[in-house]
């Protein structure tokens, strides 16, 4: 696997239509059908971190005397192609369309419902 160049403005950065704070639905994998909010986007790896999705458990040993071991659950990232933006009003997942508004600003909207995202 080639190394990922994480410098700003590099050609390896992938333009994603998903942003932090969007509500998304998982369309494939073990959590298929679940919805959650995007906590973080990783554009150089084309991955997203979604709240409550793709959780893994880790058993942590005690590091000091008198401390007990614990089990931690943590969200891991998903590939951006495995999620779609979810409309909470219409209860449907849809592709995203970027268009230029009358005032010249770029906006995002859902293709199925026409709902504006931002």
From Swiss-Prot:
GO terms for cellular component: ribonucleoprotein complex; ribosome. The keyword Zinc-finger does not apply. Keywords: Ribonucleoprotein, Ribosomal protein, RNA-binding, rRNA-binding. GO terms for biological process: translation. InterPro entries: KOW (IPR005824), Rib_uL2_dom2 (IPR014722), Ribosomal_uL24 (IPR003256), Ribosomal_uL24_CS (IPR005825), Ribosomal_uL24_KOW (IPR041988), Translation_prot_SH3-like_sf (IPR008991). SUPFAM superfamilies: Translation proteins SH3-like domain. The keyword Secreted does not apply. It holds the Pfam family ribosomal_L24. It comes from the Bacteria. Gene3D superfamilies: 2.30.30.30. One of its GO terms (molecular function) is structural constituent of ribosome. Part of the 50S ribosomal subunit. One of two assembly initiator proteins, it binds directly to the 5'-end of the 23S rRNA, where it nucleates assembly of the 50S subunit. Belongs to the universal ribosomal protein uL24 family. This is Large ribosomal subunit protein uL24. It comes from Prochlorococcus marinus (strain NATL2A).
